[in-house]
Structure formats: C-alpha cells, structure tokens
Amino acid sequence: MNGASRMTLPRLAVAAVAALALALSLTACENVPTYKQPSLIRVIDASYAAPAVNVTVEGTLIAGNIAQGTITAYGAVPATTAALVNITQATGGLLAQISDVPLAAGSQSSVFLTDNPAAPNGFALGVLQDQQVAAATGHSAYRFLNQAVNTGPVDVYMIPGGTTVANAIPLITALPVGGTPTYINIISETVTLVITPTGVIKPSYTSPPTSLTGGEVRTVLILDSQLTSNPPVVVFTANDVN
C-alpha cells in the first residue's frame, strides 16, 4: 500500500466517530413526529329553546355555558373523518349528539345550534362548513343565517354611503328561516347593513356604517328581537377570515 492511501489509527478513529454521529443524526431525524395540521371549529348558538350549554368536540371543550346569540372564537381540534360532537346542559346532562362529523386538516367549521320548527320547544344541531380563504382583492364575502322564526323571511341590504334604503337593491330577497347558507361576494366599500321583513322597508334593523377594505369573510346571524318590534331582528356578526 502506498503512502497516499494509508490511514493512520488516529485518522481511522476520527472517521469512525464522524460516521457514528451521522448515523445517530439520521436516526433522530427519522424519529421526529410529523406535524398534523388541526381543524378549527367554533359554536353558533341560535336557539331560544335550548338552555345554557357546553359544547365538546372529540372530548375537547369548545364552548362553556353559552346561550342564544353567542358566536364563539375558533378552537383547534385534531383533524378526523368522524368527530363526535356533544351538547350538554351547563348544569349537566346530555342534550344532543352528532357523530361522524368530518373535520379536515386546516378546515374551519361551525357547530350550529338552532330551534326546531317541527318541535316548538325543541332544537336542532348541525355543522356548517366555513370559508377559510380570504375574499378576493377588493371584495368581501358575507353569509347570512336567518333564524328569526317570528319575523320570517327577510330582505338584506348592503347600502353604500350616500344611498337610502328606498333607492337600494336588496342583496338577498326573501331569505327564509333556516335557508341553506352560502357566501355572497360584494365590492368592498363603506356600507350599512339593513334587514327588513320581506317586502317592506320598515320596521328595519340598521347597522352602523362598516368600512370594508377587501378580503373580509363574515357570517351574520339574524335572530328575532325579543323585547321590541322595531327593530324586528337583532344581528350578530362573526369574523371568519380577516
């Protein structure tokens, strides 16, 4: 063996240590757990009939001691194809349950508690899929949930500054109670939300002017006003995105 290919004992030791360190490093990398993106979920309580409730998803408490007119912030739960959602009285006792709820990684959903038209003292439970991507540049997305059982169908206006409701075109006409919710995109500007019983201008709910700059995604819950006839409804707005 010539001198160019000969390795001394010290060099062999260094090479062996380096090889061992590399092997341990690779093993450590292989044992790092893979990150799994969670699913985001919240609760929208629109039920007059239901008592104060707690809501758990896969055993995780998402909302505690909430009642009608509440829209909670999103909470994170592990993604799954078959989540179990439990609604219990805040004082104890199971009220309702849904199983096999798909909660995809990175998705946003809402547990939706409503009154049951077929049972005046009962309530219904469902899960809505929420938009998780910002509205297009220069646009805003709105979804309206009509649960104003006594008022019935409503007309929804998004009125630009300087325009009156008499000169405005409804964004939605005759939105039914419990109708299938979809997002509607509008051009972003300063608008006033006005909601009236279908076919009339008064009585109405009128919001303060809202400045929309683009990208907003909102869910608007419409409920009966319990103490007044004018406005006939009350409104709760949640930020889905931005």
List each model region and its residues.
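Bacterial N-terminal signal peptides that target proteins for export
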Residues: 2-16
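N-terminal non-cleavable signal-anchor helices
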Residues: 15-18, 78
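Alpha-helical transmembrane segments
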Residues: 19-23
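C-terminal motif of bacterial Sec signal peptides marking the signal peptidase cleavage site
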Residues: 24-28
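Intrinsically disordered, low-complexity polar regions and short flexible loop motifs
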Residues: 29-242
